[in-house]
Structures are given as structure tokens and as C-alpha cells.
Regions:
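ATP-binding glycine-rich phosphate-binding loop
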Residues: 52-111
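ATP-binding glycine-rich loop module of kinase domains
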Residues: 99-160, 165-171
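Conserved kinase catalytic-core helix
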Residues: 147-148, 223-255, 260, 270
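Conserved structural core of kinase catalytic domains
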Residues: 157-229
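Catalytic activation segment of kinase domains across protein kinase-like and atypical kinase folds
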Residues: 252-328
């Protein structure tokens, strides 16, 4: 545990406490208010735009200008936000911490959380200067900013909201293992690379919402043989609906790594099983039951919107070999999600899920694009979208087609 000052402004405490006591962050308005209150009394700039909701950023290749991103002391900045940090896990270059704060010192049951993602900039990759907006580490920040507008505009709740970002020195994170604050193999490898001078001296820090339900993969591994058809239907609808919303405004959007462990879950407090959420997807209404969980898309360091958000990783030779290109492909993310989901590495015994759910998945990803020369062993589709359009075996060519026409979602459409 990285201990930091827990004293934050009393007025700020009261505002956040009120949100938590009223049931948490189920409503979009509460999520937006939480971000405002969390940044009170700090000099951090919010990453979302509250006023000009459709304004993203100008064509500029400098991430520092695009996001008004400054270099700051890590400890003093987190102190201003409030609370302490708990180390959660590490990826190849990114490390996740959980911010924990008690707004009311007299009520320790009242706890708020936020996410802190620390990302190093590798030197060996041919991604250019650390200020280059097309570096994967920076493209992810821009993607979160542009996609957050869909939440701000009440078009979908299914995206993790960014709160703020800043740069800081890598040194503080190298010292954490020496002080036995973190003991983790991947983190040890990160420290070793730091000591071998494989990273730049600056790291990027992202403050974001915290999803308290973990990731979808862990949830499904534990519950896949217990979930009802209704619960499967809601989970799949949430994923497909947010893709449909994004692709309507940004047809070229590709997540490029949409698998269950890159999707987070938010628990919904005060669950009323009779609650029905009304979705409007491109002028089509859907009525979605409350199952106590809300998915949120996350991990966008592989994502791109050609012509809007370029990502250097997408232009690499190795990504071209797995059909990850800066080209529109509305079916790619759908295919990758369901192909990986049904592999033994994800759900141990896929045949134990309800037959109706299996049949739905087989309609979305038929055998012709799941095996053989059309797909890699790890589920990467090798066909361009123009080739998909010519294949009658693929009934649905986009996420919107699936929720609009497949019988699996009949119960969600108005009669």
C-alpha cells in the first residue's frame, strides 16, 4: 500500500458523500459530478468536456497541447485528490493502482475509489517522441477523451470515464519494490527494464473511474455455468450496443483488442430486478433488464479511428499480419470478442453455457470465420471487411445488425 495524505476539503467530502449515500454512481449525472468533485482543490484539468460536448481536440501531434498535460509530482498530486493507493496488477508496461479514500472520517463504511494507471514509454519501440500523439500510450488517452462524449451526451453508459492525466518521473515507481511496497513478478520485470534504461524517464499517469466488479473474464470464469439466458443476453447487448453507438459516429473505430479481460464491470447498487433501462440506438428502442452489472469498455492502447486518432501500433508490420490495420472494419471487434470468449483459455467448459446462448454465438461467428485460413489460432480474423460483405454465411456484418435483427434480442425490442 502506497500511503498518502487522506485530508481533502470538507466541502468536497460532503459532496462526494452525498453521491455515495444516494446509491453510488449508477446515473451518468452522478458519474460526471463525482469527477468534478474529485478534482476540486487540485490543479488537474478534466479530460472530459462538460460545456462543448462534441468538441474533442484540434489536429495537433503534441499530446501535451491536446490534453493540456503537465508534468507533476506524483505524491503531491495524489495527496490533493485524496486517499491512499493500493497496487492491483501490472501489464507489459502499464500498472494499475486503486485509489481509496474515506470522505467522512466518522463513517469508515463510506469509501470512494478511483483508478490510477501508470504507463511507461519504451525506448526500443519505433513510436517516436513521448509527446507524439500517435504513440499507443497517448492514443489511448485521446481515445478515452473522444469516447467519453458518448457518456456525457447520455448515448451510452458503457465506457470508463477518464478523469485527468499528467506526466511524472519514473523514479518513484522503481523504488516501490525496494521498499517492499509491491511484490509482483511483472512489476519486478518492469523495474529491471527501468534499471536497464529501456524506458524514458517520464511516465504517463491516468486517473479514471474505478470499476468495482473486476473484469468480465474473471467474472465469466467464475459464473459461466450459473448465468441465466437473461443475464447472458444483457451482457452481450451492453457490449454490442456501445460498439453500435460508437461506430455510428465514427465508422472507422476499432478497439482491436476487444476480449473479455479488456472489459470491466461496474456493480449497480440498490438493484431492483424490475428496473428496465431504455436504450435508443440509432432511433431504435430497446428495453434492457437490470442484472446488477454494467460493462464498461477499457484498454484502448490498440484502438484507432483512422483520420481522427492515429495509433502507431496499428501501422506496425506485426499487426498487419493479424489484420489490425487503419481501415474501417465493423465486424472485427465483434468477431474477436466472441472467438476468444469461446476458447478454452477463456471459458473452461464452453458447452456448459445455455444452448440458446451457444446458438447465438454461432450465428454471429459461424465456423467459416472461426477456423482454418480465415482466422488465427488466437481468434484474429484475417479477412478484410470487403471480403466479409461478400460472405452470405455471415448474417450480421456489424454490432448494430446483431441487436437490431437477431432473435436473441427479440425480448428487448418493443412489441
Amino acid at each position: 500500500m502506497l500511503k498518502l495524505n487522506n485530508n481533502i476539503n470538507l466541502n468536497k467530502n460532503n459532496k462526494i458523500s452525498e453521491i455515495v449515500q444516494n446509491g453510488g454512481y449508477n446515473k451518468i449525472s452522478e458519474r460526471l459530478d463525482f469527477i468534478k468533485f474529485l478534482l476540486d482543490d487540485t490543479d488537474l484539468k478534466p479530460m472530459i468536456n462538460y460545456i462543448d460536448k462534441d468538441k474533442y481536440f484540434y489536429k495537433d501531434k503534441n499530446i501535451l497541447n491536446l490534453l493540456e498535460k503537465k508534468s507533476k509530482s506524483f505524491k503531491s498530486t495524489i495527496k490533493k485528490i485524496g486517499g491512499k493507493l493500493l497496487y492491483v496488477k501490472s501489464g507489459t508496461t502499464g500498472h494499475t493502482f486503486k485509489g481509496i479514500s474515506y470522505p467522512d472520517e466518522n463513517n469508515l463504511d463510506l469509501c470512494i475509489n478511483y483508478g490510477v494507471k501508470v504507463v511507461a514509454y519504451p525506448k526500443k519501440e519505433n513510436y517516436g517522441d513521448i509527446k507524439d500523439s500517435s504513440r499507443p500510450e497517448n492514443a489511448e488517452l485521446l481515445m478515452l477523451k473522444i469516447l467519453s462524449s458518448f457518456v456525457v451526451n447520455n448515448q451510452t453508459p458503457h465506457i470508463v470515464l477518464p478523469i485527468s492525466t499528467f506526466n511524472t518521473s519514473i523514479n518513484i515507481f522503481v523504488s516501490l519494490t525496494k521498499n517492499n511496497i509491491i511484490t509482483n513478478k511483472k512489476y519486478d520485470q518492469f523495474v529491471e527494464k527501468c534499471e536497464n534504461n529501456e524506458f524514458h524517464d517520464t511516465v504517463s499517469v491516468l486517473i479514471s473511474e474505478w470499476a468495482d466488479g473486476g473484469d468480465l473474464l474473471d467474472f465469466l470464469r467464475e459464473n459461466y455455468n450459473k448465468l441465466s439466458i437473461r443475464e447472458w443476453r444483457v451482457i452481450f447487448f451492453q457490449i454490442l450496443s456501445v460498439l453500435a453507438v460508437i461506430q455510428t459516429k465514427h465508422p472507422g473505430f476499432r478497439h482491436n483488442d476487444l476480449k473479455a479481460n479488456n472489459i470491466l464491470l461496474q456493480k449497480i447498487n440498490n438493484v431492483d430486478k424490475n428496473n428496465i433501462y431504455k436504450y435508443n440506438i440509432n432511433n431504435n428502442e430497446y428495453y434492457v433488464p437490470n442484472i446488477g452489472l454494467r460493462i464498461k469498455l477499457w484498454y484502448f492502447d490498440f484502438a484507432c479511428i483512422p483520420g481522427e486518432i492515429d495509433n502507431s501500433k496499428v501501422f506496425a508490420d506485426w499487426t498487419d499480419r493479424i489484420n489490425v490495420k487503419p481501415e474501417a472494419h465493423p465486424y472485427y471487434d465483434v468477431h474477436y470478442f466472441f472467438s476468444t470468449l469461446t476458447s478454452k483459455n477463456f471459458i473452461p467448459n464452453y458447452k456448459k453455457i445455455p444452448e440458446e446462448v451457444q446458438q447465438f454465438i454461432e450465428r454471429v461467428v459461424p465456423k467459416c470465420v472461426k477456423n482454418g485460413t480465415n482466422s488465427t489460432e488466437r481468434g484474429r480474423l484475417l479477412l478484410d471487411y470487403n471480403e466479409i460483405l461478400k460472405m452470405p454465411e455471415i448474417i450480421y456484418k456489424s454490432p448494430e445488425d446483431i441487436i437490431k435483427y437477431d432473435s436473441f434480442f427479440d425480448k428487448m425490442r418493443p412489441k
